[in-house]
A protein has these predicted regions:
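Active-site SXXK
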Residues: 1-29, 265
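Solvent-exposed, acidic/flexible segments
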Residues: 1-6, 22, 42-50, 57-62, ...
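Residue-level preference for non-acidic, small/hydrophobic
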Residues: 2-9, 56, 81, 163, ...
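Acidic helix-start/capping segments at beta-turn-to-alpha-helix junctions
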Residues: 21-40, 72-73, 94-103, 183-196
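A mature extracytoplasmic/lumenal domain signature
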Residues: 5-7, 11, 33-35, 72, ...
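Active-site-adjacent helix/loop patches that line small-molecule binding or acyl-intermediate pockets
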Residues: 33-34, 43-180
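Structured C-terminal helix/loop/strand segments within mature extracytoplasmic catalytic/sensor domains
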Residues: 145-305
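Short glycine/serine- and small hydrophobic-enriched flexible loop segments
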Residues: 7-15, 58, 62, 165-172, ...
Length: 305
């Protein structure tokens, strides 16, 4: 879901520019907490859309994603995705640690133009077969394991085909007749492809290279998996991963420019041996990520041979 959030951020920046508002990816923006009590302890923050988006692609940063949600808006996101033909992709809440109680930001340009959505949270839930979707036999809540499944009908979601088709439009936008689905220009597509394909050691300010948590191939489930060092730097993985509640997904365009191997791959796997939702015991490193790595490696080797 974070990839379309980024796409619609670029889309909205272009919309604002067409209305005469001086804002771009590199523009400095000011974030002010809307909660009055929180504003007493949380100072205004100055950043840029470029930095926020880089953090999302490099380490799947939740806080950066939440800021962009305030910028784009829930209903605007859902309406635009539906208009673009991606009606199985739906945004309903922010990201952890607590998606319903994260900071809401007012976003302004350095010229003091207010550009955040800050719409009300009365979001209409899509009426489709995902309603009533439940997972698990137990759930972890407030430090206690409770019997009963967790209802996912109000969670963020996207179908595997939506994800697959979205990334194809980003990699090869000229191949689609309906390229007006998103209001993006050539520079926007170049920007997306650049950051989708970066490793952590290629980040803007090298802030992730000094943290051992963010190893070289962090956020690259395909090809690299749990390997911490990038052994073949000729292979570029243009991707966005997702991971929550036992589900791991990678959505990618994989290319080796030297050997002329390229393919799209979108795959998801659910690992939750104890059937407890929200306990953070999901066999990601043991099962999920190695599976995704081996799947992509097998396809890559077959195409190479």
């Amino acid at each position: 879901i974070k990839l379309p959030i980024v796409i619609l951020t670029l889309d909205k920046i272009n919309e604002l520019r067409s209305k005469g508002i001086n804002v771009s990816l590199k523009s400095k923006i000011t974030l002010s907490p809307l909660d009055q009590e929180m504003s007493l302890t949380q100072k205004d923050s100055i950043t840029s859309f470029q930095n926020l988006i880089a953090d999302i692609f490099l380490v799947s940063d939740n806080s950066a994603s939440n800021v962009l949600i305030d910028f784009v808006g829930y209903n605007h996101f859902n309406t635009k995705m539906n208009q673009a033909g991606f009606n199985k992709t739906y945004l309903n809440h922010k990201f952890s640690p607590d998606p319903y109680y994260t900071i809401d930001w007012e976003i302004k340009t350095m010229l003091n133009d207010r550009i955040s959505s800050n719409e009300d949270r009365d979001i209409v839930t899509a009426d489709d077969n995902t309603l009533g979707l439940k997972k698990g036999e137990k759930k972890f809540k407030d430090g206690i394991v409770e019997f009963g499944s967790l209802d996912f009908s109000q969670k963020n979601r996207s179908s595997i085909m939506d994800m697959h088709n979205i990334i194809k439009r980003i990699i090869f936008p000229s191949k689609f007749d309906d390229d007006n689905a998103f209001n993006l220009n050539v520079e926007d597509y170049d920007f997306l492809r650049y950051w989708m394909s970066r490793f952590t050691y290629e980040d803007l300010g090298n802030k992730f290279t000094t943290d051992k948590k963010y190893f070289e191939s962090y956020n690259k489930f395909f090809i690299h998996g749990v390997d911490t060092v990038v052994t073949n730097k000729n292979i570029r993985v243009y991707n966005k991963i997702g991971q929550a509640y036992g589900t791991s997904v990678d959505n990618a365009y994989i290319r080796n420019y030297q050997d002329d191997v390229e393919f799209f791959l979108t795959a998801t796997i659910y690992t939750n041996k104890n059937n407890i939702i929200n306990d953070n015991v999901y066999e990601y490193d043991e099962t999920a990520i190695p599976f995704l790595a081996k799947l992509s490696q097998s396809l890559y080797n077959n195409l190479k041979d």
